[in-house]
Swiss-Prot record:
Single GO MF annotation: magnesium ion binding
NCBIfam families the UniProt entry points to: malate_syn_AceB_Halo
InterPro entries the UniProt entry points to: Aldolase/citrate-lyase_domain, Malate_Synthase-like_Aldolase, Pyrv/PenolPyrv_kinase-like_dom, Pyrv_kinase-like_dom_sf
Protein name: Apparent malate synthase
Cofactor binding, note field: Divalent cations. Mg(2+) and to a lesser extent, Mn(2+), Co(2+) and Ca(2+).
Cofactor(s) of this protein: Mg(2+); Mn(2+); Co(2+); Ca(2+)
EC number: 3.1.2.30, 4.1.3.24
Function comment: Involved in the methylaspartate cycle. Catalyzes the biosynthesis of malate in two steps. In the first reaction acetyl-CoA is condensed reversibly with glyoxylate to form (S)-malyl-CoA. In the second reaction (S)-malyl-CoA is hydrolyzed to malate and CoA. It can also catalyze the condensation of propionyl-CoA with glyoxylate and of acetyl-CoA with pyruvate, however the CoA-ester hydrolysis reaction is highly specific for (S)-malyl-CoA.
Residue positions binding Mg(2+): E159, N180
Top-rank lineage group of the source organism: Archaea
GO BP annotations, alphabetical order: oxaloacetate metabolic process
Length: 435
């Protein structure tokens, strides 16, 4: 069974939730109205007016009215997709029925919002049969309101062991004539309720990192042609921790992440994009340290590594408690083992264009050279290494460019900021390479 993606977007970077009604405010929809005005890199790829956890139970009826009002009036201008979250629970028929009623009212064509609604987010799902119940409600709503069958997309939040196991069944269930699960869009982790469902405990009370769940969600999305999104990172002041979480996620194939604030939206929108400039990393003190570019050289300015040139033409490299006496070739090999390069957008595009030209000329593989002059304690060492590029290497390098192209296609409101970030020429080349 081959995987066919049924959605235009291949990537989602940001999943931003907003309360639908705030109690005690003169305008209970003020946070919705504010979110609906976001543009450019401050606007998420997916905006989620949240009528579940982010909104108090006694405000949810008003929240439905606010969703209709704000989306009807601001939805046409909003640059991302709009997917309200409604109430649902795998163990509560009454809650599921409330969610159905909320969706039915929001999508009523007479209310003027449905033309700007891309789908809905269903929380607290259980096994695959529960997913089918939600899908059936979507189909009933579409039939009731004269909408095209399958036109409303469905995303779920994985918040239980049942839902985690259900992802393994999804690939086989999608496309069966008895359901419309091809409407599926996002698989979103909900680590808070997942932790509760798993009865997990930590000494500090903080959430476990759940790398297994994130891997399983990414795998489930890949197998079914969907998009995986990580859950909320609730320490909103810990920007570096948020970046590290996203970096770890991307290594698992999970590009998207929940954003709780406009500041997190900007971070999550920019983090997956190729960097503007390349950088060299040097392993020192058990971690990778980014070197400082100075006059075309890469300078290490730390205390965990020292280098001295001795009189016989050799070198002494001290790393932690180790003292290594090396000749020039041995030093070069040692430093090559300790260094890595993060390519810039320009580097990736240059390499892809070079490989495309070589392939056009009949070559199946070519060598790409990376070279730098390292400076440690004032001692300069030239290093270089060749990396073979074949079709597999090319396709792996293409992923960040495919992401950029997907963003450029679906988020024209970000074109100006992307041109400012990279330069108009490299943006033009990046949108053309690989096509």
């Amino acid at each position: 069974m081959s995987v066919t993606r049924h959605y235009d977007r291949e990537f989602v970077r940001t999943f931003f939730t907003s309360p639908t009604a705030v109690d005690g405010e003169e305008d209970s929809a003020k946070m919705l109205r504010s979110a609906g005005q976001l543009r450019g890199l401050q606007a998420p790829d997916v905006w989620v007016p949240d009528n579940e956890d982010a909104t108090a139970p006694n405000m949810r009826a008003e929240g439905v009215e606010n969703i209709i009002d704000v989306v009807a009036n601001q939805g046409a201008e909003f640059p991302g997709e709009i997917h309200p979250r409604v109430v649902w629970h795998r163990e509560s028929p009454a809650t599921r029925y409330k969610g159905f009623q909320q969706m039915l009212e929001i999508t009523d064509p007479e209310n003027g919002a449905v033309e700007h609604i891309d789908g809905f987010v269903i929380p607290e799902v259980g096994d695959i049969d529960d997913w089918k119940k939600a899908d059936e409600f979507f189909t009933i709503i579409e039939h009731e309101h004269g909408l095209e069958e399958g036109s409303l997309s469905m995303s779920v939040i994985v918040e239980s062991g049942e839902a985690e196991l259900a992802m393994g069944d999804l690939r086989e269930e999608m496309g069966k004539p008895s359901n419309n699960l091809e409407r599926m869009f996002l698989l979103v982790d909900g680590e808070v309720d997942y932790t509760k469902d798993m009865r997990a405990m930590t000494p500090t009370g903080e959430l476990p990192p759940w790398p297994e769940l994130r891997h399983n969600t990414s795998r489930g999305a890949s197998a079914a042609g969907l998009i995986a999104v990580d859950g909320p990172y609730d320490d909103i002041r810990d920007v570096e921790g948020y970046r590290e979480r996203m970096k770890d996620n991307r290594a698992k194939g999970m590009t998207g992440i929940w954003s709780l604030t406009p500041g997190q939206v900007v971070e999550a929108n920019t983090a997956p994009l190729p960097p503007k400039t390349g950088s060299w990393l040097l392993e020192a003190g058990g971690q990778e340290v980014e070197l400082e570019a100075q006059d075309g050289k890469q300078v290490y300015d730390g205390d965990d590594l020292s280098l001295e040139e001795v009189s016989d033409g050799g070198y002494v490299l001290q790393a932690g408690g180790d003292r290594l006496e090396l000749d020039e070739d041995e030093l070069t090999e040692e430093l090559l083992d300790r260094t890595a390069y993060i390519p810039s957008m320009t580097d990736i595009v240059d390499s892809m264009e070079e490989f495309e030209a070589a392939k056009e000329a009949g070559k199946g593989a070519i060598a790409m050279t990376q070279a730098a002059t390292l400076v440690i304690n004032g001692v300069e060492v030239d290093i270089s290494k060749d990396r073979m590029w074949d079709e597999a290497t090319y396709q792996a390098a293409q992923t960040p460019i495919t992401l950029f192209q997907d963003v450029y296609e679906h988020r024209p409101d970000q074109h100006e900021e992307l041109a400012e970030m990279y330069g108009a020429d490299i943006v033009e080349r990046a949108t053309a390479v690989g096509n």
